[in-house]
Amino acid sequence: MRSHSGSAAQVTNGRHTLGSWLASAAVVARASPMDTPPWHPSPIQTRTGIWTGIETHWARAHGRFLVMGVRPLQSVRSEPFQKSWIFLPRIMADKLTRIAIVNHDKCKPKKCRQECKKSCPVVRMGKLCIEVTPQCKIVWISETLCIGCGICIKKCPFGALSIVNLPSNLEKETTHRYCANAFKLHRLPIPRPGEVLGLVGTNGIGKSTALKILAGKQKPNLGKYDDPPDWQEILTYFRGSELQNYFTKILEDDLKAIIKPQYVDQIPKAAKGTVGSILDRKDETKTQAIVCQQLDLTHLRERNVEDLSGGELQRFACAVVCIQKADIFMFDEPSSYLDVKQRLKAAITIRSLINPDRYIIVVEHDLSVLDYLSDFICCLYGVPSAYGVVTMPFSVREGINIFLDGYVPTENLRFRDASLVFKVAETANEEEVKKMCMYKYPGMRKKMGEFELAIVAGEFTDSEIMVMLGENGTGKTTFIRMLAGRLKPDEGGEVPVLNVSYKPQKISPKSTGSVRQLLHEKIRDAYTHPQFVTDVMKPLQIENIIDQEVQTLSGGELQRVALALCLGKPADVYLIDEPSAYLDSEQRLMAARVVKRFILHAKKTAFVVEHDFIMATYLADRVIVFDGVPSKNTVANSPQTLLAGMNKFLSQLEITFRRDPNNYRPRINKLNSIKDVEQKKSGNYFFLDD
């Protein structure tokens, strides 16, 4: 072997020269085609994708170097090739800690040929980097031996593998890991007594894991899943931080924790009986009457739990937690299914629990409610289902803005490419609406038992989104069913005949097959259409879950599938009832963009029922305000502009909103604050000025 001192060997592929790139970073030795180093393994034909036009001939770790044999691809060779040996300093690889994630649902060794193991360069060199046989339930990947070439990811026929590079400084801060090749949580939120801690982050980033650990229901293993540490070692690890005293109190049984579950629609399966009987049984603080009045549950005491709607179940679950004696109160998404008024009442009820000796932790994706509810914020970032990192506590405004901006200034770290900015929809002026008018509906009345709905005549156009604003029980769904011709009005004129596609509020999967089978059965033509794939399937990330069983999907995954099914059906009008339920803040904005883009391209009309104020203002071209007494007498007003409609709706609720100057997100003013009083005096309940 003849080495060239001071310069790197040139391997030209017609487009790039390796030498110029490698000269400062590696020592390269060139050999003739017949020369081989003494440690040369058998040649393998793989492409690493590191350099265009170059393929790796072989690779091996040797001392302080990672040695690779490279040569130009056959298609770009212009002369008899020469092999080159590249010695990359191994420190380049050691700066990043790799974690290998294997998706337990997708990995099927019995149905594949173990392509991951056969194609791995490290395995070809005789090391056990990947272990799998047809009899295995799941593949195992050694994170210490893995060189991060990414070949196994591309070769896996089920897309079950992912290799994620992790900054090495986080390796010492691992709080919990479930098992090999599974999710890792780094750090923990630090709760403070007498204050409300808000947690914000995407789904699958470790918020529920953090809640379980802080509640004492999950013992943190500090990443040592094969040899879990004892509590003394855990307390030593947290020595000097507020969490040391916190866990010490939990171990001494000084702290009792209660968690309000995320999926309230599962409650009827576990709790049987009437609302009143369960509340009587759980009432340890004798505050049941006050809490029921605050959460509007008094009239529901005689109703069975299985007969409650989504919003009623949510309020019932919050009430059950609030009337018990505990030191740690945890609320996982307390605003799902609630309208704006109920969300604020729930927030006030949760804040009424504040006590100098109590810890309160809230996970919430409605940023307006989280802003109103919290005293300080911890953001969680990372790669969903791979790893999550908890930031230090921030003030409420700063914490939410850091999450939306995707940049943590204290760590000088960017965890998202683009910032999330909430801009209000451009409202068409009245003259344009008259010219584009496609459909008119007459004034109507409908009586159903004790409930009566009066509809004021109005009109809507194609390529327009109407957001319906009103409390639960004001007849929004009844209004749509009448427009669709499914309900006949008791009084009023003829309704235009329209085809309607409907996404219900409650999603209960009945399909027993995979997502792919469900889509093929329900929207066969749409889900393979290129325009639909671009506008709907890709942004909603349906491809990631398309081979999973429908029955095993999480709430957020079900919501995305239901939205795709609704938009995939050919219709004149699309009714979408609460598309934001169970979606995180990023997914909510993406779902809003999907609906907006689809309606624009398809030239159809959408009626959206949405209680997340940020999403409602983003979606709305015009709004229909429902007022009156819920479940008794209500009126559906004619469509109004966004500003006029929002002002009317918020004046009924006696709530004022302002906008954040950085990202324009709506923020609820604290009751009787200077801003709140000023806006109420001027009549600007919804403040749009930048």
Identify the role of each PLM range.
Residues 37, 113-135, 140, 151-168:
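Iron-sulfur cluster-binding cysteine motifs and their immediate structural context
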Residues 169, 192-286, 366-397, 459-531, ...:
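ABC ATPase nucleotide-binding domain signature region
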Residues 175-180, 186, 221-313, 324, ...:
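ABC-family P-loop ATPase nucleotide-binding domains
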Residues 197-200, 390-457, 462, 635-690:
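ABC ATPase nucleotide-binding domains
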Residues 304, 331-334, 341, 350, ...:
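Walker B catalytic motif
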Residues 317-318, 346, 563, 591:
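Hydrophobic anchor residue at the start of the ABC signature
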Residues 343-356, 588-602:
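Helical segment within the ABC ATPase nucleotide-binding domain
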Residues 357-363, 603-609:
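Conserved H-loop
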